[in-house]
Amino acid sequence: MKNLIFINSTPKPHEQELLNQFADSISADVTHSKQYEPCDVAVILGSWKKIIKSREHLEKLSHHKLKNDIVDNHRGKLMVFETPLLNRKITQEHDSYRVGLNHYMRGLSDFKNENSLPNRFNSMGIDVKDWRSKGDHILVIGQNLYDASLFGIDLELWLINTIKMLLKNTDRKIIVRDHPENKSRLKEVVNKFNYTNRVS
């Protein structure tokens, strides 16, 4: 069985080092190829995105071109390292990663976490608080408009429907906070629909 680590699936040196360490730990081969090479198990780091075909764009995003080539041509198992969902810091370097089989998203990947013991979660020191049903406001937090986690959902439409539902079911103030990459896009949606002074 040939396990092949595609080191150029990420342009970041610290992530390439992670892949090298993983390769050493399982005695896998590492390739520096910029295109797919046949193997039984392909290992990549990061999500893949469809990219615009301009030459300049392709050069900047060659790691996405490689990952698309792997996803399109590989017929065996695909192991995907991706940024963590839990205990994530605002940094490019992480203490842990999620690892999915054949994909990186819930519902599409097998994370082999069914019936997992709580020791890994508990080791992160996350304090899970009870759902708060009282307070002065409800906070609605936006996501990057083009993030894969949205599965194609129109975030602006989701926001409008969520605000309408909240206005019908609570008297609390509704505060919308956008994702930093969106600048003030969701705020513009809120302002465009001229909601009551309960929404900001």
Which residues fall in each region the model found?
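Well-ordered, non-membrane alpha-helical segments in soluble/globular domains
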Residues: 16-23, 56-68, 154-165
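Flexible, charged surface loops at secondary-structure boundaries
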Residues: 1, 33-42, 71-75, 130-135, ...
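A nucleotide-sugar donor-handling region in carbohydrate enzymes
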Residues: 76, 81-153
